[in-house]
């Protein structure tokens, strides 16, 4: 029996297409996706989108057992994977360039674990599963987003923003950081580290509002620097557990008095933010207004 050449060509093309689908892992369900979900700074600050994503997930990822307990209502009944914060150690460094054998071994192990975790995520998504990595606050501020850099660019993925420490701390003091009377800039920074080019001393020279994330923070050093660039009566505020109605606390002082009157040594590690700037007192007032905007609104 003779075959129609067009029919035969169609069968061949269909077979090639099917083989490609099987080969690249697609076509199983087509609904697999990797999410990074910002959980907010408190259990009740998760967004509606975040809740829906977690409900739809087959696998959830957390950094620790503590986080699993905090988000137990969301994690219940899900397969749980762990991605500890320590996996960020030496990310971006080539272990082969490290001379110290012990440090090199740590870097090699971290790189290997990151790669294995990325491979697991890819395999799960290729199988049509939804993987949701839950992260406190907003993942775009010191979160673990490096996994997206290790995954194929065409892998379906999405970041669900969360209410971060900056937003929650600003709400706690009931003042908006961009309003600094005669400044508009807001500098988000952290403790200095060796090799850093934009060190805090340089940033302070602008006189802008400053927001310090306090990991490994040296208060005496930072305030000795602040005192060289800000008037002693410049207001400061430390917000502990920003956004948590049960434990949130605001400690107020000034650049000149802080080290003398504040018990900063007993602040809970990595659970507080330092705000520095005139906005804490003046609110939304401007020194001379903004004439261009005022003219637009007067028309």
Residue ranges and their predicted role:
Residues 29-36, 103-110, 123-131, 148, ...:
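A contiguous loop/helix-start segment that scaffolds small-molecule binding in enzyme catalytic cores
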Residues 58-60, 80, 176, 187, ...:
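Short, well-ordered beta-strand core segments
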Residues 135-207, 248-252:
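Class I SAM-dependent methyltransferase SAM-binding "motif I" and its flanking Rossmann-like core
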Residues 2-11:
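Bacterial N-terminal signal peptides that target proteins for export
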Residues 25-160, 272:
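Class I S-adenosyl-L-methionine
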Residues 67-69, 88-90, 164-168, 185-187, ...:
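Short gly/pro/ser/thr-enriched loop/turn and capping motifs at secondary-structure boundaries
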Residues 10-20:
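Bacterial N-terminal signal peptides
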Residues 78-85, 156-160, 177-184, 231-239:
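Short hydrophobic/aromatic-enriched beta-strand-loop microsegments
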């Amino acid at each position: 029996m003779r075959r129609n050449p067009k029919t035969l060509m169609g069968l061949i093309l269909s077979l090639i297409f099917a083989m490609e689908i099987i080969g690249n892992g697609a076509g199983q369900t087509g609904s697999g996706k990797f999410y990074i979900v910002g959980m907010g700074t408190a259990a009740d600050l998760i967004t509606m989108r975040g809740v829906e994503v977690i409900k739809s997930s087959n696998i959830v990822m957390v950094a620790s057992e503590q986080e699993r307990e905090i988000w137990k209502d969301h994690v219940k009944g899900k397969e749980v994977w762990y991605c500890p914060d320590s996996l960020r150690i030496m990310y971006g460094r080539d272990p082969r360039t490290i001379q110290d054998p012990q440090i090199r071994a740590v870097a090699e192990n971290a790189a290997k674990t990151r790669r294995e975790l990325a491979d697991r995520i890819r395999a799960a998504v290729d199988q049509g599963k939804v993987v949701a990595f839950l992260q406190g606050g907003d993942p775009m501020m010191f979160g673990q987003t490096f996994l997206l850099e290790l995954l194929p660019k065409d892998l379906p993925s999405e970041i669900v923003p969360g209410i971060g420490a900056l937003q929650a701390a600003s709400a706690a003091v009931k003042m908006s950081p961009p309003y600094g009377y005669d400044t508009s800039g807001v500098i988000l920074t952290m403790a200095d580290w060796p090799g850093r080019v934009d060190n805090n001393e340089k940033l302070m020279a602008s006189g802008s509002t400053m927001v310090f994330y306090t990991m490994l923070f040296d208060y005496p050093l930072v305030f000795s620097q602040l005192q060289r660039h800000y008037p002693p009566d410049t207001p400061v505020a430390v917000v502990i557990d920003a956004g948590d109605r049960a434990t949130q606390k605001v400690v107020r002082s000034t650049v000149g008095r802080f080290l003398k009157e504040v018990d900063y040594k007993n602040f809970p590690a990595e659970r507080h933010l330092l705000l520095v700037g005139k906005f804490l007192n003046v609110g939304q007032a401007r020194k001379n207004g903004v004439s261009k905007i005022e003219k637009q609104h007067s028309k």
